[in-house]
């Protein structure tokens, strides 16, 4: 029974990470831009 209570409290515990979860999908776009900037820096060899 205490396991069910623990699982019920988990969403409240993870509500702190909501801003982080909102940012996570943007990270691959940053990697794409980083690759483009890197290639521009080396002259698209």
From Swiss-Prot:
One of its GO terms (biological process) is photosynthesis. Residues 1-8 form a propeptide. SUPFAM superfamilies: Photosystem II reaction center protein K, PsbK. Keywords: Membrane, Photosynthesis, Photosystem II, Reaction center, Thylakoid, Transmembrane, Transmembrane helix. It comes from the Bacteria. InterPro entries: PSII_PsbK, PSII_PsbK_sf. It is a single-pass membrane protein. Pfam families: PsbK. It is found in: Cellular thylakoid membrane. Its main location: membrane. GO terms for cellular component: photosystem II reaction center; plasma membrane-derived thylakoid membrane. The chain crosses the membrane at residues 24-44. The keyword Thylakoid applies. The keyword Membrane applies. PSII is composed of 1 copy each of membrane proteins PsbA, PsbB, PsbC, PsbD, PsbE, PsbF, PsbH, PsbI, PsbJ, PsbK, PsbL, PsbM, PsbT, PsbX, PsbY, PsbZ, Psb30/Ycf12, peripheral proteins PsbO, CyanoQ (PsbQ), PsbU, PsbV and a large number of cofactors. It forms dimeric complexes. PANTHER family: PHOTOSYSTEM II REACTION CENTER PROTEIN K, PTHR35325. Belongs to the PsbK family. One of the components of the core complex of photosystem II (PSII). PSII is a light-driven water:plastoquinone oxidoreductase that uses light energy to abstract electrons from H(2)O, generating O(2) and a proton gradient subsequently used for ATP formation. It consists of a core antenna complex that captures photons, and an electron transfer chain that converts photonic excitation into a charge separation. This is Photosystem II reaction center protein K. It comes from Trichodesmium erythraeum (strain IMS101). The lineage of its organism: Bacteria, Bacillati, Cyanobacteriota, Cyanophyceae, Oscillatoriophycideae. The gene is psbK.
């Amino acid at each position: 029974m205490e396991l069910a209570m623990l699982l019920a409290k988990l969403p409240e515990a993870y509500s702190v990470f909501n801003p982080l979860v909102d940012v996570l999908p943007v990270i691959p776009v940053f990697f794409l831009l980083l690759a483009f900037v890197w290639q521009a820096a080396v002259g698209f060899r």
